[in-house]
């Protein structure tokens, strides 16, 4: 048998049928749905008189457009568009009999946090959702990626997806990370080096000592942003860290099934002589706390750097840099650590887990946010929120001047009430810094939770190592 990558193994195990041109019918193990990309799909089933093929493998949760302020359990307190979408998901989930976590359920939260938290995401699975950051689940050694609304309907109806296989790409982070450097810094550094198109046409497997040393929360941060690097999906091979995280979760295997599952999961790794179409290697010790300066995730530099000039680039990137600098209101040559911030957002499917909140709380404990600063912490799920309150993190944030919100996608995207105003500049733990992503003419700098917390305290982008 020829050597295989982890991606090869999962793909081959799920191919139900293959055409002569390489197009495959892929079986899907888990289908996650939310309120924004599913209404038309459910309506399509209804119009065709179809049922959900595997409701026991379909998980629904409202997250993108739900308010994160108190009173949201009352539909009359929601903005009209939020109310309509949440009500539609509620109706569809109950009518079609899928697993459902409504806003009144403490288990509700961002779908890519709820899935792993509840044990729905397991190694070796195929996972899809009508959301690009489905790649998050690849941290478990699952093949996970986003799909469009028409594909959502197809998976609901058949539990399969028509796909062509991507190429294999390996990103290895060697050695150890320096103190103060996090998973978010790793993935921003990777994208800064490879560009947002570096992974186009590939599934990326992240490996190396620095990746192995990460917790599951950190690994989810890495895979979450595989899509920002252009990849179809991101993968990290499962190991004892993975098994320990999954064990005992509500929908994880139990008893003899657990032992059998772990024995199989231990075979999910890339063989030594497997073929890679592209390899990128970065030394962990070379990675520093990282921030974005422009309007693309690839506009990432160490916090110790200065804002680049358009002349530092070539080709079409010259004009792109000029436009980004104009939009962001920055001057070439200024220190990144001199950029003043007026808003801080800690949350999202990238960095809304308990470990992220602990890291931010460690920075702000005993301190106050800068006068005039608007800062909010939005836990990724109701269970994360409850745990943070039990650990005293919520009080640390509130004492420092942060808003302590309910679970949801919040300010990651300008789809719900949590938005930037024109010209506001935000240090954000989310995943995209596009023009208008957080609000009309809002300016976004992507950072780790610790770096976001540091910015809240100092009022500017700050090297957290100095605090």
UniProtKB/Swiss-Prot annotation:
Pathway info: Amino-acid biosynthesis; L-leucine biosynthesis; L-leucine from 3-methyl-2-oxobutanoate: step 2/4
Molecular-function GO term, any one: 3-isopropylmalate dehydratase activity
Reactions catalysed, as given in the entry: (2R,3S)-3-isopropylmalate = (2S)-2-isopropylmalate
Top-level taxonomic group: Bacteria
Enzyme's top EC category: lyase
EC number per UniProt: 4.2.1.33
Disulfide bonds: none
Gene3D superfamilies: Aconitase, domain 3
Classification via Pfam families: Aconitase (PF00330)
Biological process according to GO: L-leucine biosynthetic process
Residues the record lists as binding [4Fe-4S] cluster: 349, 409, 412
Cofactor(s) the protein requires to work: [4Fe-4S] cluster
Note accompanying the cofactor annotation: Binds 1 [4Fe-4S] cluster per subunit.
InterPro entries per record: 3-IsopropMal_deHydase_lsu, Acnase/IPM_dHydase_lsu_aba_1/3, Acoase/IPM_deHydtase_lsu_aba, Aconitase_4Fe-4S_BS, Aconitase_4Fe-4S_dom, IPM_dehydratase_rel_enz, IPMI_cat
HAMAP family on file: LeuC_type1 (MF_01026)
Family the entry assigns: Belongs to the aconitase/IPM isomerase family. LeuC type 1 subfamily.
Subunit field text: Heterodimer of LeuC and LeuD.
Protein's UniProt name: 3-isopropylmalate dehydratase large subunit
Organism: Ruegeria sp. (strain TM1040) (Silicibacter sp.)
The encoding gene: leuC
